[in-house]
């Protein structure tokens, strides 16, 4: 027997567009998450503002409709455990793909949506689901954050307006006037009784001190001649995403920027992401400079220290043992030392293999980026390891 529901009192319950909008939002979010790796490896994001927009291709949702069949023998049927969106049967549709000739079926609707760099970082945060920084015993900075409501006051900003208390104040004033008129035996009636400035009450908010962990990120980049334009672009993209993301997620985090050839230099953020160098490669020079920065400014007992180094893995052979010793030293004073090797040469043995063989400290996290699409996977490995709660 058919059951007919009465929607006369609630027109929203049978609004099919609500379900369509929900599915559309899911489709958009799914497409964005699937394209995170492509955006990070292909888009020029270094140095862009938070309002920089990126285009994301999205497959359109088609309306359900009845169509004529193909006069084929038999039809496909399910067994009861199919999932939503799953296609039954192979069909004989011929679509034009690449250089395979012309097809005879309608294609998929593809359109583009735009998201800003700030929204991109939100999706990265959601995808990674990172924990908070490790808590150090003596590494806390006291900051003020929004606290609890502590009573009322007669002045304040509109967002803190206490509506209920304001109405009660108005009613009390109205009742007081009624009593005064009664005592004066006046026949005056109170018809309209508007709010006055004196009725307004605002929440008094006491800022609550909050303790945050100290943390410093040391970004070290090989800027030598063997790092060509593509490698330097990948390294800078790698560091830029890390810096932008961590600045948004954590309140108190310091950054130090170092690049090196045969000698290392401490630079500011702009110079790190935009200046180019050429010359030979002593990996130990960059790592030792980071150790000096730690010794001068960031005592390990009071700071969470995270160091990340990016290079193509080529190093002057006489410096190899010094580089291994320097990495071992920095692992001892850091929460984590990440080594990212970019587009390594296939003709020579790079430092990735030497480091991985000789450094057994669990704080050493090596990743290798053989092509652009590996950038996102390397970022996920580094971030999850770097900020993992102990």
Curated annotation (Swiss-Prot):
Biased composition (Low complexity): 89-103
Record-linked InterPro entries: Spore_YhbH, UPF0229, vWFA_dom_sf
Organism: Clostridium beijerinckii (strain ATCC 51743 / NCIMB 8052) (Clostridium acetobutylicum)
Family: Belongs to the UPF0229 family.
NCBIfam families: spore_yhbH
Name of the featured protein: UPF0229 protein Cbei_0567
Disordered as annotated region, ranges: 77-108
